[in-house]
């Protein structure tokens, strides 16, 4: 379902914990991190789509989260042609998204990345609200920045946008094995046999 301009209606989810840290998911078999997101099906409201995507991609249900805020309007990004399937090139331009800020009221162990046959993420972690976005695929960075900025007004304590240092992004990309011994792990993964 595309709008007249070629944008697919979509929802994006910024999930925070009680420390205002943001949930990041690592894309399956990739080295990029992103927030949960997904298309709005015909007849769904953005809120219904958000809850469906949250359960499909993260394994959390409505009782695990509280809606803190949402963007006032659609935020758009265009997808480069080489990422678009040949059969829809010329019609499809990108995504237009309503972004939701959710506070997790459940527990970390409620997260289940294997709710579907084809999971989106193979690892996840909490990270500071403001983090360098170079771990996000380039064409989504601007919309992420705009969503984080707009929704930051809903945070329970003010967070000041301090330009992050480069080592913060490296930490987000580090795997469990590459951590320093005294550094706590915040990455959540499941063993392959589950």
Curated annotation (Swiss-Prot):
Extent of motif Nudix box: 38-59
Single GO molecular function: mRNA 5'-diphosphatase activity
InterPro entries from the UniProt entry: Nudix_hydrolase (IPR020476), NUDIX_hydrolase-like_dom_sf (IPR015797), NUDIX_hydrolase_CS (IPR020084), NUDIX_hydrolase_dom (IPR000086), RppH (IPR022927)
Keywords: Hydrolase
Cofactor(s) the protein requires to work: a divalent metal cation
GO biological process: mRNA catabolic process
Superkingdom of origin: Bacteria
A Pfam family the protein falls into: NUDIX
Biased segments, Basic and acidic residues type: 179-194
GO-annotated cellular components: cytoplasm
Disordered: region residues: 158-194
Domain (Nudix hydrolase): residue spans on this chain: 6-149
The EC number(s) this enzyme carries: 3.6.1.-
Function: Accelerates the degradation of transcripts by removing pyrophosphate from the 5'-end of triphosphorylated RNA, leading to a more labile monophosphorylated state that can stimulate subsequent ribonuclease cleavage.
Family statement: Belongs to the Nudix hydrolase family. RppH subfamily.
Designated name of the protein: RNA pyrophosphohydrolase
Annotated source species: Janthinobacterium sp. (strain Marseille)
């Amino acid at each position: 379902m595309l709008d007249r301009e070629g944008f697919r209606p979509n929802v994006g989810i910024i999930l925070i914990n009680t420390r205002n840290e943001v949930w990041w998911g690592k894309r399956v078999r990739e080295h990029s991190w992103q927030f949960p997101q997904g298309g709005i099906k015909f007849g769904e409201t953005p809120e219904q789509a958000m809850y469906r995507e949250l359960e499909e991609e993260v394994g959390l249900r409505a009782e695990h989260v509280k809606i803190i805020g949402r963007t006032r309007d659609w935020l758009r990004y265009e997808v480069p042609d080489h990422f678009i399937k040949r059969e829809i090139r010329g019609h499809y331009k990108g995504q237009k998204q309503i972004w939701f800020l959710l506070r997790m009221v459940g527990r970390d162990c409620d997260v289940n990345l294997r709710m579907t046959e084809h999971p989106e993420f193979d690892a996840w972690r909490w990270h500071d609200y403001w983090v360098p976005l170079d771990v996000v695929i380039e064409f989504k960075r601007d919309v992420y920045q705009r969503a984080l900025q707009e929704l930051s007004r809903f945070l329970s304590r003010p967070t000041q946008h301090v330009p992050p240092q480069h080592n913060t992004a490296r930490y987000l990309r580090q795997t469990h094995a590459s951590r320093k011994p005294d550094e706590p792990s915040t990455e959540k993964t499941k063993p392959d046999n589950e």
